[in-house]
Amino acid sequence: EIVINKALEHRHLVSENTLLREQLAEKFKFEQIISVSEVMEQAINIAGRAAASKSTVLITGESGTGKELIARAIHYASPRKDKPFLAVNCAALPENLIESELFGHEKGAYTGADRMRKGRFELADSGTLFIDEIGEIPLPTQVKLLRVLQQQTFERVGGSETVHVNVRIVAATNRNLEEMITTGDFREDLYYRLNVVRVNVPPLRKRKPDIPMLTEFFLNKYSRENEREIKEISKEAMDLLMKYEYPGNVRELENVMEQAVVLSRGSIITTRDLPMTVRSAQSEPKSPDVMLDGNFNEQIEALEIELIRYALDQAEGVQTKAAKLLGITERNLRYKLNKYGMK
């Protein structure tokens, strides 16, 4: 009976895992990527054609453009879609731990290594390993990574046993690797091994036609999550969203829409629900002649007053929240309120 129960439990787990992989494959289809702009469609097209191959893919683009989304779509459109997809962000790891994270370590390899630990390459065996911010990998570890790309073998940190893996690498960076090669910070031979197929993900400011669709997607997402009945955004608010440049790209737009949904007082997102950074996009930058037309201190004070009023409006008068939105202490906010007679 115990054996039968274990067999049934195993079968149930296998069934659950299969269902989960099918759901992920559906979620991360290329068709699910929101885009109508020509530049983004070009990137999706290149990534889609590369998916069926075994080749290494290098995804380039600014932070927040959706490089990991492209990497996942490549995996789930590839013959490895039923195998693991693992991601590691090298920028989020201390430099001295990157090698151990990628290749694992043996017991006693360094202080605190009290047991053997497999790295991402072993855990992603037969699947895809997404190495984000690959430009952050130190030179000694780059040598080891090059060997994996060439031979699919490596040793764990502190070990001598050769580990064999079958892993497809999709790498990404927001840095200029060609420039890093000239400065000696990135190996040229590794670069050519990585740069077999290159996918350039455009910044959001270069794909403005996608903003309305992305805005609607995030509006619906965060309305559901926060149990809000917000289904619409005003024309004026959308105009501001279209004018803004988004230095943080799609990730910033998502943040803007989440904040707008949370702080909105009605059923429609209006301009007052948008952060000051976006609202300031409604007018062209003032020329130096206009900005210098008056006292400098008066210009600064007028801007401070406008920011404080907006923060208090967003925080519904709660000074603690307003100070947090402004990035200052509550004490500093109280001082400015007294200074400008804004009690």
Please place each PLM-identified region on the residue numbering.
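Short gly/ser/thr-rich secondary-structure transition/capping motifs
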Residues: 108-115, 151-156, 289-291, 311
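Regulatory hinge/linker segments at domain boundaries
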Residues: 19-45, 227-232, 239, 281-302
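Conserved post-Walker A coupling segment in P-loop NTPases
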Residues: 32, 45-111, 122-138, 203-208, ...
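Conserved RecA-like P-loop NTPase ATPase core
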Residues: 20, 43, 65, 88, ...
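Nucleotide-binding/hydrolysis machinery
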Residues: 5, 11-12, 18, 80-83, ...
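Flexible nucleotide-interacting loop at or near the entrance of a catalytic core
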Residues: 1-60
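AAA+/SF3 P-loop NTPase mechanochemical coupling elements
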Residues: 116-126, 130, 137-144, 155-174, ...
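Bacterial C-terminal helix-turn-helix
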Residues: 146, 291-343
